[in-house]
A protein has these predicted regions:
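Beta1-alpha1 glycine-rich phosphate/pyrophosphate-binding loop at the start
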Residues: 3-73
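FAD-binding core/adjacent interface of flavoenzyme oxidoreductases
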Residues: 1-8, 24, 29, 36, ...
C-alpha cells in the first residue's frame, strides 16, 4: 500500500505537519519513535514562550496536547523507530523494525539534539549549572 504521507518525528514540527496534512484530507502516518516520542520538549519543564499559554505550560503537557489534536484530525501515530530511508525515485521507502512504509511524500522532522561541548565536568554538572534548553 502506498501511503499519502509519512512523517518521521513527533516533536512540534511533526505534529503540526500531521495536523495540517490530516485537515487537507490526507492520511498522515507519524513515526514517533519507540523511546523518544514527543521530541526534546518531553524533557523540558516550564515552557513560557509558546503562544496561547499565557501562564506557561509543561513541555510534556504541550506535546500530549499536540498529539491529541493530531489524532483528533486523523493522524495515525505509530511508536516505531526508523532504521532506513530510501528517498530515491517517485515512491519513497521508510523502514522500521516493524516493516516498510511506501509513500510519495516523507517529512523528516527529527528535531534537535543537544550539542555538548565535551569539557571537563560537563556531564557531572548537567542539571547543576550546565543545562540544555529546547525552547531557548
Amino acid at each position: 500500500m502506498i501511503h499519502d504521507l509519512v512523517i518521521v518525528g513527533s516533536g512540534p514540527a511533526g505534529y503540526t505537519a500531521s495536523i495540517y496534512a490530516a485537515r487537507a484530507q490526507l492520511s498522515p502516518i507519524v513515526l514517533a519513535g519507540s523511546v523518544s516520542a514527543g521530541g526534546a520538549l518531553m524533557n523540558t519543564t516550564e515552557v513560557e514562550n509558546y503562544p496561547g499559554f499565557v501562564e506557561g505550560v509543561l513541555g510534556p503537557e504541550l506535546m500530549t496536547r499536540m498529539q491529541e489534536q493530531a489524532e483528533r484530525f486523523g493522524a495515525d501515530i505509530r511508536y516505531e523507530d526508523v532504521t532506513a530511508l530510501d528517498l530515491d525515485g517517485e515512491i519513497k521507502r521508510v523502514t522500521t523494525d516493524d516493516g516498510v512504509y511506501e509513500t510519495r511524500t516523507v517529512i523528516i522532522s527529527t528535531g534537535s539534539e543537544y550539542r555538548k561541548l565535551g569539557i571537563d565536568g560537563e556531564e557531572r554538572l548537567s542539571g547543576h549549572g550546565v543545562s540544555y534548553c529546547a525552547t531557548c
